[in-house]
């Protein structure tokens, strides 16, 4: 019986840009879920809801930039609209993503308007408009954001699942893995911004559910078991993912130690990002038709490598600082 087919090694198609996109858009979408869960009827947005919306807003800005960089030619986006392919998840994503960004931006502005101080800088006085403090409008944008967030999770998972070329992609376990891992990061960032000293059982549950989902994926079929084992062969990324998961889980039990809070948040971010790297990039190195592994050289100085990753996270920091300054201007007390 012929067990191998001699073929040329295949170069990977998805580059690190798509990992950044899946990470930030996943965190943004699940942060919306978190915000809506913290929402209370006929009341101003709580601190937890505001923090979750802030996380979603930052992610909704950074994620499209990473996706545009992955396309290399921004003008290619127009083809999704001029030649709409209803069967393609990417075509639907071209519609859902802009709607999601608009919804989250509106949600963020409305939560900001509900908690502003009377004396605002001239360029921010429009936040005091009575319309922006309407509970009905706020709930409308909560629902708008929630629906588009569900669409984001659905299309990003389906985009990977529909390829059907690899056992680790074409699996129902992909949805809970992407959902729970991103939600853990979103919840962890929200709690960190609120500076909560209470132990988060929800965060621990999400981390455990992610681990169980990964185990379910690994043992879903013989091919998946083989491919999953190859991910640990000669690569440190899969081990880094596991280490970050352990650190994040341990730190979640020590919420009153601020140093451990910092470590826990960094571990959560590392876990969520590395998990997507392993599932998206590392999985592509596993050959589909022979026992060899496809080559992939990571270049730290390349735009499609380390430089691109650092630039996207740098953009996230820049957006965080800028939005943080706006929040401080709108909520500062009158002297």
Predicted regions and their residues:
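Extramembrane terminal tails and long inter-domain/linker segments of multi-pass membrane proteins
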Residues: 1-12, 81-84, 118-135, 285-335
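Alpha-helical transmembrane segments of multi-pass membrane proteins
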Residues: 1-2, 63-71, 153-156, 320-324
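N-terminal signal-anchor module of multipass membrane proteins
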Residues: 1-41, 281
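Membrane-entry segments of alpha-helical transmembrane domains in multi-pass membrane proteins
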Residues: 10-26, 45-52, 83-99, 133-143, ...
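Membrane-interface transmembrane-helix boundary segments in multi-pass integral membrane proteins
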Residues: 12-22, 91-94, 225-247, 283, ...
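Long, contiguous internal "core" modules enriched in hydrophobic/ aromatic residues
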Residues: 22-24, 41-44, 106-278
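Transmembrane-helix bundle segments that line or gate the permeation/cavity pathway
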Residues: 23-42, 52-79, 92-119
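Hydrophobic alpha-helical transmembrane segments
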Residues: 23-33, 98-102, 182, 242-249, ...
């Amino acid at each position: 019986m012929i067990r191998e087919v001699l073929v040329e090694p295949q170069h990977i198609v998805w580059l690190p840009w798509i990992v950044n996109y899946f990470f930030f858009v996943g965190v943004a979408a699940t942060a919306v879920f978190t915000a809506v869960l913290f929402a209370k009827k006929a009341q101003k947005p709580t601190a937890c809801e505001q923090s979750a919306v802030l996380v979603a807003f930052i992610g909704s800005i950074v994620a499209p930039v990473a996706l545009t960089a992955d396309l290399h030619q921004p003008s290619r986006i127009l083809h999704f609209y001029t030649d709409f392919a209803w069967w393609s998840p990417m075509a639907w994503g071209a519609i859902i993503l802009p709607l999601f960004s608009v919804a989250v931006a509106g949600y963020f502005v409305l939560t900001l308007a509900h908690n502003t101080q009377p004396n605002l800088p001239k360029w921010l006085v429009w936040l005091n408009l009575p319309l922006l403090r309407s509970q009905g409008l706020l709930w409308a944008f909560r629902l708008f954001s929630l629906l588009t967030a569900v669409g984001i999770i659905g299309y990003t998972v389906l985009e990977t699942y529909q390829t059907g070329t690899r056992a680790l992609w074409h699996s129902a376990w992909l949805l809970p893995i992407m959902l729970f891992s991103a939600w853990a990061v979103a919840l962890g960032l929200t709690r960190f911004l609120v500076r909560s000293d209470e132990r988060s059982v929800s965060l621990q549950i999400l981390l455990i559910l992610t681990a169980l989902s990964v185990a379910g994926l690994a043992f879903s079929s013989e091919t998946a078991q083989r491919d999953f084992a190859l991910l640990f062969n000669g690569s440190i990324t899969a081990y880094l993912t596991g280490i970050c998961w352990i650190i994040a889980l341990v730190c979640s039990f020590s919420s009153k130690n601020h140093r451990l809070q910092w470590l826990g948040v960094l571990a959560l971010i590392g876990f969520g990002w590395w998990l997507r790297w392993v599932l998206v990039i590392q999985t592509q190195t596993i050959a589909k038709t022979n026992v060899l592994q496809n080559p992939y050289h990571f270049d730290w100085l390349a735009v499609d490598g380390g430089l691109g990753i650092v630039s996207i996270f740098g953009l996230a920091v820049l957006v965080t600082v800028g939005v943080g300054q706006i929040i401080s201007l709108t909520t500062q007390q009158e002297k």
